[in-house]
From Swiss-Prot:
Stated name of the protein: S-adenosylmethionine synthase
Binding-site list for K(+): E45
Species of provenance: Bordetella pertussis (strain Tohama I / ATCC BAA-589 / NCTC 13251)
Matches recorded under InterPro entries: ADOMET_SYNTHASE_CS (IPR022631), S-AdoMet_synt_C (IPR022630), S-AdoMet_synt_central (IPR022629), S-AdoMet_synt_N (IPR022628), S-AdoMet_synthetase (IPR002133), S-AdoMet_synthetase_sfam (IPR022636)
Cofactor list: Mg(2+); K(+)
Cofactor stoichiometry and binding remark: Binds 2 divalent ions per subunit.
Start and end residues of each stretch annotated as Flexible loop: 101-111
Length: 387
């Protein structure tokens, strides 16, 4: 972003949002398969509607997985355990319609053990990674705080402090930037599903005092900050009953909240041979290490691939004028220190593990849990020394 004064907005959604229900089921299927068969090829898509879950896509695996039970367990964990919520893990219908991966794709992706590192990309495409110094996790402030809000909503729902909360929720945060830096929160929107008996006045007070204000450090919320809580006035019907949920519908929530471009490929349900996912994780890893090394305040990385070809077509670094050395020099360091071939990424980030269900809600980036290996800054020292 240019160094000037402006407003910028990002949104997030809770784990109970219908599209996120679908994402979590898809990644839970992937994890269940990877627990038995880490070399599986998985493209698991999910649709969820009132009382119905449809599982479809392409899976090639030796694993024996009860897909219906995985879907039910995921819905239960999210909190849809009552027919009043529109979907109930015990009684919903689950339809399974998986095919195997196309052999035309497999011949370009699979390699012999002797040619292991030259596994081709599972598809063509372009991916972006981004990092900046606006938050401790080197994420843009609007999306980082938007995630904190819906995480807080989930926490207060699950621990019973606000028992009238239901699983579906959305947040939106608008920051005022001064000289290109986040200075204060201009507007917070938080819509949360709730039980029918609670008054709107009680919802507004609890959301502002118990969810919004504790989610921000002192100084960001000012007397001028606007709070919009359940602006429609009522949010009883939600989740898959309110809207049909589909895997891959929240790609901006999953990434950087619109602060940088997006290549268009979704993440959830895909094994790491799909560069839509693995290369986007690697691009974040690169960008975060560049910023952690002090080589730039902001870093955007683009990589692109051709199906069946291992080497990326391009690796492009853009620091928006914040770099301490030229962008071309940073890109050269990236090529020296990061193996961005698909199998190189899998090895570098240890991606053949059942780690993906956690990624499917509250963002794939800016997370501190140990599963998120692409959030490590272990290459920063080498980049700094090389510069």
């Amino acid at each position: 972003m240019a160094n000037n004064d402006f407003l910028f907005t990002s949104e997030s959604v809770s784990e109970g949002h219908p599209d996120k229900v679908a994402d979590q089921i898809s990644d839970a299927i992937l994890d269940a398969i990877f627990t038995q068969d880490p070399n599986a090829r998985v493209a698991a898509e999910t649709l969820c509607n009132t009382g119905l879950v449809v599982l479809a896509g392409e899976i090639t695996t030796t694993a024996n997985v009860d897909y219906i039970q995985v879907a039910r367990d995921t819905i239960r964990h999210i909190g849809y355990d009552n027919t009043e919520y529109g979907i109930d893990y015990k009684g919903c219908a689950v339809l399974v319609a998986y095919d195997k991966q196309s052999p035309d794709i497999a011949q370009g992706v699979d390699r012999s053990s002797e040619d292991y590192l030259n596994q081709g990309a599972g598809d063509q495409g372009l991916m972006f990674g981004y990092a900046c110094d606006e938050t401790p996790d080197l994420m843009p402030a609007p999306i980082w705080y938007a995630h904190r809000l819906v995480q807080r909503q989930s926490e207060l729902r699950k621990d019973g402090r606000l028992p009238w909360l239901r699983p579906d929720a959305k947040s939106q945060v608008t920051f005022r930037y001064v000289d290109g830096r986040p200075a204060e929160v201009d507007t917070v929107v938080l819509s949360t599903q709730h039980s029918p008996e609670i008054s709107q006045a009680s919802i507004r007070e609890a959301v502002i005092e118990d969810i919004i204000k504790p989610s921000f450090p002192e100084g960001l919320i000012t007397p001028k900050t606007k709070f919009l809580v359940n602006p429609t006035g009522r949010f009883v019907i939600g989740g898959p009953q309110g809207d049909c949920g589909l895997t891959g519908r929240k790609i901006i929530v999953d990434t950087y909240g619109g602060a940088c471009p997006h290549g268009g490929g979704a993440f959830s349900g895909k094994d790491p041979s799909k560069v839509d996912r693995s290369a986007a994780y690697a691009a974040r890893y690169v960008a975060k290490n560049v910023v952690a090394a002090g080589l730039a305040r902001q870093c955007q990385v683009q990589v692109s691939y051709a199906i069946g070809v291992a080497e990326p077509i391009n690796i492009t670094v853009y620091t928006e004028g914040t770099g301490v050395i030229p962008d071309e020099q940073i890109a050269k360091l990236v090529r020296e220190h990061f193996d961005l071939r698909p199998k190189g990424i899998v090895n570098m980030l240890d991606l053949l593990r059942p780690i993906y269900t956690k990624t499917a809600a509250y963002g794939h980036f800016g997370r501190s849990e140990p599963e998120f290996s692409w959030e490590a800054t272990d290459k920063a020292a080498a980049l700094k020394q090389g510069a």
